[in-house]
């Protein structure tokens, strides 16, 4: 039973959802993207429930991001049973889901509890976050890029 048949996620939105309490431990390009959101008067909405935050952004347009941090260097959310199911829903409704670079649905798991960073929601917003990450990595010497992707 679908509550909203043929649902489509807006291509863009004005909501970003992330735990800003961890802002200081986010990679630099993620900080830049969040500052971009603030500079453009996007609304920060984060209640700490992945499914609830994703659901709101699915209907209203927005991005949910849970990047890697200094503490969780590979990300915190599990690929197989947290990221993949919602990435499937996002893509089926016209949205997008990446680990910052790679499409979530194309990541081959290395183990059942594998953790990954997640950027999921409206296509234009996820693409913009990905652009910030790619631009930052392109500017860095190769050894720093390797540290950034692991930090």
Regions found by a protein language model. Give the residues of each.
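IMPase-like, lithium-sensitive Mg2+-dependent phosphomonoesterase catalytic core
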Residues: 1-151
């Amino acid at each position: 039973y679908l509550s909203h048949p043929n649902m489509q996620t807006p291509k863009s939105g004005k909501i970003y959802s992330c735990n800003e309490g961890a802002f200081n431990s986010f990679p630099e390009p993620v900080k830049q993207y969040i500052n971009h959101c603030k500079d453009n008067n996007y609304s920060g909405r984060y209640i700490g429930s992945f499914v609830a935050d994703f659901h709101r952004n699915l209907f209203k347009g927005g991005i949910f991001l849970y990047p890697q941090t200094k503490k969780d260097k590979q990300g915190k959310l599990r690929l197989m049973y947290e990221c993949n199911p919602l990435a499937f829903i996002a893509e089926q409704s016209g949205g997008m889901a990446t680990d910052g670079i790679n499409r979530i649905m194309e990541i081959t798991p290395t183990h059942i509890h594998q953790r990954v960073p997640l950027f999921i929601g409206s296509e234009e917003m996820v693409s913009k976050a990905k652009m910030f990450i790619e631009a930052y990595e392109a500017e860095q010497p190769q050894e720093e890029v390797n540290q950034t992707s692991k930090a």
